[in-house]
Amino acid sequence: MSGSNGLFNPTADITRAQLVTTLYRLAGEPAVTDKSALTDFSDVAEGKYYTDAVCWAYAEGVTTGTDGKFNPTDKLTRQQMAAFFFRYAEVMDMDTSARGDYSSMVNADKLSSYAKEPMAWAVGAGLISGSDVTVNGVAAKDLNPRGNTTRAQVATILMRFCAE
């Protein structure tokens, strides 16, 4: 991960394009021969910093997009992050068999169906543990699946992921 203007900016939200670019770099920036993302996603064009990364991620199945769009500048949610890392791990032939129980975490019921298996894996693999919160005076963990993901959170999860 790199910052801009000499700053890492850890509290800034990360975008979908930034995470896919990070995963593409982690994969060694493989040659991109399948550019179908340029026609299948109406919001991905040649010449952007993320073009090759999105084309690679789409061709490999790391991303699927939504309704003909990748939404590169949209802020990345925690459930999207779990899905990207899970699919990336599968593409890289990593062990994705770990499963963790997130059902007791605050906001676990807000998790979208597409993200349930990836989130169970991310919790089981120790990548995501939830944020500390207090609910009715009791300490709890908040899964916050639809909350935005900061650059610091992605850096932390990336370090845990690489340690696997």
Write out the residue ranges for each language-model feature.
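Feature responds to low-complexity, polar/acidic, surface-exposed segments characteristic
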Residues: 1-20, 24-51, 60-79, 88-116, ...
